[in-house]
């Protein structure tokens, strides 16, 4: 069946593609972003120093979105942060020396590809990494008929004796991440359970 490009972003995508360097990478993954039970190819292409093109190949069309940032060759990560059986993808938008900042992108027929946002309308950013004096990670925990998304961010105290920060839990529904709990972390060692979360627990459901 002949595929078509979703027209809502076609012009912007073509403009971005026209600026793409010849060496731009396009790492791809498979994720069932439309919930039809079939894995869709999803790719990320670096088209300039600060812009990327996110593309998904659905059964009858391609859909694109322009994403600000630079993945520096890191791949997309398929996830299902709400446990509804329809996948999302984590997009590495900012890559530092020790930490990667991800945003979570989803698809709907009405809005195409778009980021999961917090209740105030901002894209939800999740950090992974940290280095010797910081710790950031995320994961998912089971909830009745769903999953909850957990984000952990902490920094070493001035004397390096412990970590302080917060552990935040979100409920993601219809692309909106609603705050459930925000628990302060104080006097915790790096191995403290309050600082633990496993990104693998957000993997797509079998």
Give short role names for the model-derived ranges.
Residues 2-5, 11, 15-73, 193-206:
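Terminal domain-start segments
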Residues 35-45, 81-93, 143-152:
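Acidic/hydrophobic-patterned starts of short beta strands in beta-sheet-rich repeat architectures
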Residues 64-95, 101:
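Mid-chain, structured segments of secreted extracytoplasmic proteins
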Residues 2-5, 23-33, 124-206:
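Acidic, small-residue rich beta-repeat scaffolds with periodic aromatic anchors
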């Amino acid at each position: 069946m002949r595929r078509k490009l979703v027209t809502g972003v076609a012009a912007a995508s073509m403009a971005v593609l026209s600026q793409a360097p010849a060496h731009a990478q396009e790492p791809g993954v498979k994720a069932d972003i439309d919930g039809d039970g079939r894995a869709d190819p999803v790719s990320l292409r670096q088209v300039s120093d600060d812009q990327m093109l996110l593309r998904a190949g659905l059964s009858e069309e391609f859909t694109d979105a322009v994403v600000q940032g630079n993945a520096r060759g890191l791949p997309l990560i398929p996830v299902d942060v709400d446990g509804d059986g329809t996948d999302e993808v984590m997009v590495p938008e900012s890559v530092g020396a020790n930490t990667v900042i991800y945003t979570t992108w989803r698809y709907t027929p009405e809005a195409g590809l778009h980021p999961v946002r917090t209740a105030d309308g901002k894209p939800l950013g999740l950090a992974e990494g940290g280095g010797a004096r910081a710790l950031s990670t995320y994961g998912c925990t089971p909830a009745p008929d769903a999953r909850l998304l957990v984000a952990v961010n902490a920094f070493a105290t001035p004397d390096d004796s412990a970590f302080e920060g917060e552990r935040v839990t979100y409920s993601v529904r219809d692309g909106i991440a609603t705050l459930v709990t925000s628990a302060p972390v104080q006097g915790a060692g790096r191995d403290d359970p309050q600082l633990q979360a496993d990104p693998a627990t957000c993997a797509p459901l079998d």
